[in-house]
Amino acid sequence: MIRGLLRGIKRFWSRLVLTRCRPSCHRERGGFMGRTGVDLFIEDGAYTTLSSAVVILVVLALLFSSTAAIWSMSRAGDTQVAADSGALAGANVVSSYHTAATVVDASILSLGLAGFATIGTGLVAILIPGAEPVAGNMVDTGIEIIKTRNKFAKSASEGLQKIETALPYLVAARATQAVSAQDTDSVTYTGTALAVPRTSESDFAALKGSEISTDAIKDTSDDLEYAAEELRKASEETAKAKERAWLADCGGSDESAIGRYSCMWERARSLAKLSDIENPHYASSVTWEPQVALDRAKTYYRQRLANEEPQGSSAKMEAESVARKTFYTYAIKELDQSFIKDDGEKISFKIPFLPRTPGEVKGTQLYTDAMWPTSTNDGGETYQLHYGTGCPGYKNGSPGGLASVVDYDGRELCKKCEFDVVTLGRALMPPSFIENGFEYHFDEFKDALEDYVECRNKEFELMRQTEDEADRASNAFDQAIKALSGERPRIAPPGRNGVVAFAVSSEVTTPDELNSSFNTAVELGSRGAISAAVLAPDNATAQNNVLSRFFSTLEERSGGVAGVLDGVMDVWGRLLVGYGDIQGSADELMGEMINGLGGGGGALGSIASWLGDTVSSSVAALGLEPCDLRLRKPVLTDTANVIKSPGSDIAGLSKTQDKLRSIPLGVTDPKALCEALEYQVERTISGTVFTLAEIPLPGGGSIPLTVDVATLVGALGGGS
């Protein structure tokens, strides 16, 4: 560098001196003027002492002046850094509030859904056998959750509005702190930030006016519980009657436990030799139906008719065999006309009356139908009734027409066959009164069937009543839960467009270390800078980060009330951390909770299945949109983007230099600084910690949600 400098000096003096001297006087080289020019610095190709000294002086002058210039520019940059810090700090307050408001909204909605999920599961549990002891408690717990949600929503609405009122001040205060934090021993920085716009357009009416009434749910659930209990009792009676009918038909699979001659199935197998296909067995009354017994009886009597033979060769034995065949034929005819119809709304039946005694025969067609041959004996003076034309008495007499038993009741009997109403009544009298007879168990089946039909029809009536109560309960549930599908709160706080920060610094003089004989001290006057920041979504954050941390804090805070919340916190927590896709989370949870109850059979089971589908449909019909849970982080931007943004109330801000000069140095009161910028703010929140809302706990106590006003960092706290 020195070599180049000397060469430049040499060229300068050479041109200056030689150009002036040579044309006028043509002096010889080495004259006085030549020596006092270039030769003072260069002689015989070498540098002189004078030239070296000049170079050193020039270099030192340049060095110290450059250092002073660099120091001056750095001080100007420091002011911009202070303004940037204020802008980012102010925007961070808005970001923290936005996060807090989102968490509150998520908490209220998810808490409401948790309550309805518990209520809906409880309503279904009322109808599930085995789950009814806890069903009432589940409904009551769900109602308490809804009441908790109502109180939480009201307090949160008031808290959020109060914070928004103070938000411009909080933005200014945080920015003032950030700017002042740049102070050094020699420089003081003063500044603040303005929230743009200053006014709020948030709408919390959806929270404030969203109290959900659960009175109808409570009333209908009580009615449903009573109807379900009555239906449960009726179903038990129906099941008992059905089991008695089943025992009479085919409950004799265990002879050692029930008896040797235990049921129709066993008697049909022993007496009629029916195959397993013709004579099916059912091990349980659950899978058995009464129609099985009717079909078994039809098959049995057809086979007995086909197998019937006289037990001896006498006319009396023949008469008894004919009487049995007549009874079998009559039974088949009657059974063909019998039925049991259960259409799911009413059960009706027709079961034949099979006579067991002579007296009962007189009430049937066996007594009145003219189907028995007659004859006259003793010259036509004696009329007798016979079992058939094969009777010796009939053959020995004169054949007559057919007659009924009633026509000859009380007359003289045929001495050969002695056929009369007693013969018919006696045909099955013993089997009907002792357990080794098929008819004995058939009569047991008929008695049980009559009880079963009566119980079943009563069950149908109670089932309709329970269905009506379930419908009322589902309607009450549907109407109540619709409150959650209303418009969500609109979060549009002051500063939603961004913040504009102003910063000024005090006068400063270069430090002594930079002052010397080669330069004069530099005095910098007051400097100012302006900056702006906006909020940008952070795609790198997981959607449930904030809510997961928030709920973890709540769980820690609720640890002292273990046993009060039971599974409520689990249900709420799952919905809360799934708030990003709240509808999907609610649908999935509702399905799992109802399916977790297990299925139920019978009348209650079908109603429970219907109610479960209806409740799940009500939840699905909410149609809740997915939520954007990305964190908002402050980023610097051009001040014009904020000042001239739509809705800006500082769009008329002009003469920025004048505004900067109006900031009083050393002032740390955010309100005073804002007033200097013609921007009005009010400190509406006092103290260092502000309670945003309180979550009441079932059974007493609450969890406060607080805002740390002192630091304004991570605005939401779980009671800490």
What residues fall within each predicted segment?
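Alpha-helical assembly-interface signal, strongest on the long, hydrophobic N-terminal helix that forms
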Residues: 4-121
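General detector of folded, globular domains
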Residues: 99, 103, 388-392, 401
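Long, compositionally biased low-complexity segments
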Residues: 106-385, 390-393, 418-720
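Short, intrinsically disordered, charge-biased short linear motifs at domain edges
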Residues: 379, 391-407
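Residue-level signal for mature regions of secreted extracellular proteins and peptides
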Residues: 383-384, 406-410
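Repeat-associated, polar segments at repeat-unit boundaries in modular proteins
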Residues: 408-422
